[in-house]
Amino acid sequence: MTTEKTKPHIPPGPKVKLLVFGVAFLMVLVPFLFWKGTWFGTVLSDQKLAEYLESSARPRDTQHALLQISEQIARGEREQSRRWYPSLLPLVTHPVPEVRNTLAWLMGQDAKQAEFHQALTVLVKDSNPLVRRNAALALVRFGDAQGRPELLGMLRPFTVVSPRAGVLRYRLKEDDSVDTGTLLARVETGEPEPFEVRSLLPGFVSEKLIEDGTTVTEGQNILVLAPSDAQVWEALRGLYLVGQTEDLETIQNLTGRSTHLAERTRQQARFTIEVIKKRSSGV
């Protein structure tokens, strides 16, 4: 996969800049800032930070450490934050997706680090869709369009498959809102406890593909999730910088009235279309 190193031209415009460069690339991570009822507000000592970055640390402690380092970066404490950078790179292969997701978000905070750029090219191919999407957003900060397919995916419906074979029992109805980790359905496999199907992404239930009570096979499509407003908003800001003319039709579909998209998101879609057209024409 080739990395695009040249940053695309960004025409000036205060309204567009305000929409694009607000609190950049934050929304997608929000569901993981509070993990299992744990508030990551306690300031960690250097000793604790080092301990929590070890491979033997509890995943939520590692996430706590990553969030504190990201706060140091945001405050401009470069010397303090960079001392931990060598300990971050091994976390690219951490077994827990919440940790990899937070790591991708953190690496987007310091776009001067070549090591972070390289790590993000790995994370953008992660098995977890939320990790891939955060990595794609972070890559935009490096002027790298490698994550563009993921950004486009954030604008499109996501199909949920059954992780097990058995009798499907839906928990939600169509149009219900969904957060990351929301219980979507249960699959009765013959074991004492049914297998829980939880959402990997935020959004809302767009369509049920199988009748409730039907026997499904492992890997069978069961549900379609439409993207959340926050994910669409973030993707549009990323595509503002790296989008191409072939993306215009997908983006155009977001400019009309919708019960699930805020006016600012539809406006961002129009701005993104405008700047992609200008970029393609060399203006």
Q: Which role fits each region the language model picked out?
A:
Residues 12-14, 39-53, 75-93, 111-124, ...:
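Amphipathic alpha-helical scaffolding segments comprising HEAT/armadillo-like alpha-solenoid repeats
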Residues 57-58, 95-96, 127-128, 158-159, ...:
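Short inter-helical turns and helix N-cap capping residues of alpha-solenoid HEAT/ARM repeat scaffolds
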Residues 65, 103, 135, 235, ...:
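Conserved hydrophobic register position within alpha-solenoid helical repeats
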Residues 69-77, 107-112, 139, 143, ...:
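Alpha-solenoid repeat junctions
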Residues 144, 152-168, 183-204, 224-225:
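Short beta-strand-turn/beta-hairpin segments enriched in glycine/proline and small hydrophobics
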Residues 163-177, 205-213:
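Short histidine-centered loop motifs in beta-beta connectors
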Residues 175-187, 213-222:
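A structural signal for short beta-strand/turn segments enriched in small hydrophobics and glycine
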